Amino acid sequence: MYAVVQVRGTVKTRREIKDTLKMLRLHHINHCVLIPDTPAYVGMIRKVKDFIAYGEVDAKTLEELLVNRGRLVGDIRLTDEYVKENSQYSGISDFAAALAGGQARLTDVPGLKPVLRLHPPRKGYKTTKRTVQQGGSLGYHGENINDLLYKMR
């Protein structure tokens, strides 16, 4: 399961980049989506790698994101009681563990919005014009995406 965060805006970009970000449901900077590891999604991520930060998210970070930033339709916070009543999972932590392991999907909890609206990272991005290998924030973070998501909680 990949966590994908939009880091750069789409002004003066090619139409196909904008369309791919729209297909990934990334409409604003600092929004995050959770994407399964399939060839179609990996190709989409590869196309917009210069506008996003992405990597493999772990269960602990995913649980914290769902508790703090998970929203239902109507901008209602996601709670353990709602997850227990409306899905087969016993709570947010159980759902996050299944989601990180690939056994669950976001649609298993009805009414859960697919986009997590995050804060800008505390202490800021390193730079939004360079890749991670060059000392920036763009591109593939691997397991270090959890550090970025923690700063954006």
From Swiss-Prot:
Q: Which domain of life is it from?
A: Archaea
What do the Gene Ontology cellular component annotations say? cytosolic large ribosomal subunit
* GO annotation, biological process: maturation of LSU-rRNA from tricistronic rRNA transcript (SSU-rRNA, 5.8S rRNA, LSU-rRNA); translation
Extract the Pfam families matched here: Ribosomal_L30
GO molecular function annotation = RNA binding; structural constituent of ribosome
Keyword field: Ribonucleoprotein, Ribosomal protein
User: InterPro entries given for it?
Assistant: Ribo_uL30_ferredoxin-like_sf, Ribosomal_uL30, Ribosomal_uL30_arc, Ribosomal_uL30_CS, Ribosomal_uL30_euk_arc, Ribosomal_uL30_ferredoxin-like
Output the SUPFAM superfamilies linked to this UniProt entry. Answer: Ribosomal protein L30p/L7e
Listed CDD domains: Ribosomal_L7_archeal_euk (cd01657)
Subunit:
Part of the 50S ribosomal subunit.
HAMAP family attached to this UniProt entry: Ribosomal_uL30_A (MF_01371_A)
Q: Which family does it belong to?
A: Belongs to the universal ribosomal protein uL30 family.
User: Which NCBIfam families does this entry report, sorted A to Z?
Assistant: PRK06049.1 (NF004711), uL30_arch (TIGR01309)
Q: What is this protein called?
A: Large ribosomal subunit protein uL30
> Which organism's genome codes for this protein?
Methanospirillum hungatei JF-1 (strain ATCC 27890 / DSM 864 / NBRC 100397 / JF-1)
The UniProt gene name for this protein comes to rpl30
